[in-house]
Each structure stands twice: as C-alpha cells, then as structure tokens.
A protein has these predicted regions:
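N-terminal Rossmann-like NAD(P)+-binding domain of SDR-like oxidoreductases, especially those catalyzing
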Residues: 1-194, 238, 248, 300, ...
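C-terminal substrate-binding subdomain of Rossmann-fold SDR/epimerase-dehydratase oxidoreductases
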Residues: 32, 38-39, 45-46, 72, ...
C-alpha cells in the first residue's frame, strides 16, 4: 500500500469504524463488504493467496478507497496478529472456511484445522489485541445434522454429520466459551443454506442454474446430480449478511438462527429453475451419480429464526422462487455476454462434476 493508512482511508467520509472480513472473496464476504462500505465502514478484506483466481465477486470494490485487500491464512498466527494489530478493527467477521460439505469428507484435516483451530487463533488474537472489538462467527445449520426435532432454533441439539459440521460445532462452542469466560463480544449466526448468483458453481443450486442456462443456449446436454430428495431451508445471501451486521450492533452479544422457515427439496429447486427457463420437465436432462452422494446424508434442515425476527426485527425478503429465478437470470445473462462454455464438452462428465452434491 502506498502512503499511510490515513491517506488510504480519508478519501471517503466514513462512520469511524473499521471492519475486518475473513473470506471476503466468497459469496457472503462480498455481499457483506458491499453492505459495510455503504454504511461508511473502512473494510479490510482478508483472503488466502490461493484465492487469487476467485476475486470476481469483489472486483468492483477495488475502486472504493475505503476497501483494502490483504493476504491472510487462518493457519498463520503471525500474519493474523500483524493484520489485527495494524488495522485495529472495531468489528471482525469470520467467514473464511472450506465450506463444501461433500469435500470435507475428502479434506477432513484441512477443513477442521481452518474452521476449528482457525477460529480459536482469531478469537485469541482479537482478545489480546482489540479486546473491545465485536466478533462474528459464521456457524452453520449443518451442525444440527440428523436431529429429527426440527425446526431448529438456538437451543436445538447439535448432531453434526460431516467433518465440516463437526468443525463448525467446535468453533460455535468456542465463541460461547470466550463470551462467557472472558466477556468477549463474540456471537454466532447459525446460517441455514443461503444462495445467490455469487454462489460457487460446485454447490448444487448454482450447478442447476448454470446448467439450465447452458442447456437453454445449447452448450450442455446433461447435468449430473446426487440426492434430489434432500430438503434445505434456502434463503438469499444478501438478506443474511444484513443480520450478521445487525448482530454486532446490539448492546449484548448473542447467537441467532438465520433462516427463512421454509424447506424445499433439491428436486423442487431443479423444477422451479427449469420451468422458469422454459425447458419443461428436467428429468430428460438429469442423470443421478452415486458418487455425488455424501457418505452420511442429512435429509432435512429447517430453521426457526423467531428470535432474530422478534429481537432484532430482521426478516428475509427474497422468496424461494425469486431466488431461483434471480440465479438463473444472472447465469443466462453472463453466458450470453461472454459465450462461456462454448469450449466446454457438451456433456459435463461425472468426473468434472465430482463435487457437485448439495451442501
């Protein structure tokens, strides 16, 4: 960076607050960064060096003088402490993670270390260097796992069914422990599945919308999927990051479930998208590949966000059908602009699609 922090940030009138976002190049990180910049924050986005190819979601932010991007790794304690000490954030949003549930079975140690131990390292750094900073942890509905007693709220029993979910449970309990043991302002948002046009293409919703757009443009013939019967509580990521921010504006820290209160199957999402695309019954385009199933499936997730609605006044705005249509429309427009996929084999093979099971 050229010049001092003061010259870097003074170009825009701000609210005097600085926020650090880990995982800023991801879906949630990009939406959250935009929200905070709109609210006058100085935003320091942290990303892994290996995320270099994944900055498309935040490219427009580079023109904002209140946005700064730094390299970072949850496994690098020295880097973590240096950045927190340098920027002295008022708020820390920990969104970084290997977030693909199916992949966590293959990369279990990597997933667990980044999520569980990474959160521990970040909490320790915040407690020592910026004890008054507010800390947000991205917890996950996957922590509820196979628990049959849905809908799930903040008091529901956690029964994780994947390495990803187990790591999230560890981090979730750490946040509670640091809040009660040290008085640290630390809280977790238990986010149910949330999607957007910025969702990674290895996740089932985005796989479906992109495939439908390619099929519509005759760039693809088949789509390989796993369990179509899995049901999820799907919301819009842009709605969910608003609650992340709201959680850190309260006098006292607390944990909140973030959900729509509706559940839909993968098949329902598939049918909604293909109907909107004018492709008719999707069955003729779909092939089920058992390799896309998880070793342990979570069949049903449904959240109860009553606490967030009543205490914080939050509610989701984008409906399930609106979300599906939004994602398809964006993918279709992208392909039409860029002619993307022309060089791709017209039948996307199971090997290419290997990690495309539902989150």
């Amino acid at each position: 960076m050229n010049g001092t922090l003061d010259t870097f940030f003074k170009a825009r009138k701000d609210n005097g607050k600085t926020a650090i976002i880990t995982g800023v190049t991801g879906q949630d990180g990009s939406y959250l960064a935009e929200l905070l910049l709109q609210k006058g924050y100085k935003v320091v986005g942290l990303k892994r060096r290996t995320s270099l190819i994944c900055t498309d979601r935040i490219n427009l932010l580079f023109a904002d003088p209140n946005f700064k991007l730094e390299y970072f790794d949850l496994n690098d304690v020295g880097c973590m402490w240096r950045l927190i000490n340098q920027y002295k954030p008022d708020e820390i949003y920990n969104l970084a993670a290997q977030s693909h549930v199916r992949v966590s079975f293959d990369l279990s140690e990597h997933t667990a270390d980044g999520i569980a131990m990474g959160t521990l390292r970040l909490l320790n750094a915040a407690r020592e260097l910026v004890p008054d900073a507010k800390f947000y942890q991205a917890s996950s509905s996957e922590m509820f796992g196979d628990n049959p007693n849905y809908p799930f709220n903040e008091e529901s029993t956690l029964m994780p069914a994947s390495p990803y979910a187990c790591a999230k449970v560890f981090a979730h309990h750490l946040v509670k422990n640091y809040r009660t043991s040290y008085g640290q302002y630390a809280c977790s948002g238990i986010l149910f599945n949330h999607e957007s046009p910025r969702r990674g293409e290895t996740f089932v919703t985005r796989k479906i919308t992109m495939a439908a757009a390619r099929i519509k443009l005759k760039m693809q013939q088949k789509l390989f999927l796993g369990n179509l019967d899995a049901k999820r509580d799907w919301g819009f990521a842009g709605d969910y990051v608003k609650l992340m921010w709201m959680m850190l504006q309260q006098e006292q820290p607390d944990d909140y479930v973030v959900s729509t209160g509706e559940t839909h199957s993968v098949k329902e999402f598939l049918e909604c998208v293909f109907d909107h695309a004018g492709l008719g019954n999707p069955d003729k385009y779909i092939e089920i590949d058992e390799r896309l199933f998880r070793p342990q499936e979570v069949p049903y997730l449904l959240g109860d966000s009553t606490k967030a609605r009543e205490k914080l006044g939050w509610k989701p705005e984008v409906t399930f059908k609106e979300l599906a249509k939004m994602m398809y429309n964006e993918d279709l427009a992208f392909l039409q602009r860029n002619a993307r996929g022309v060089a791709i084999d017209k039948m996307i093979t199971p090997e290419i699609d290997m990690y495309g099971g539902e989150k």
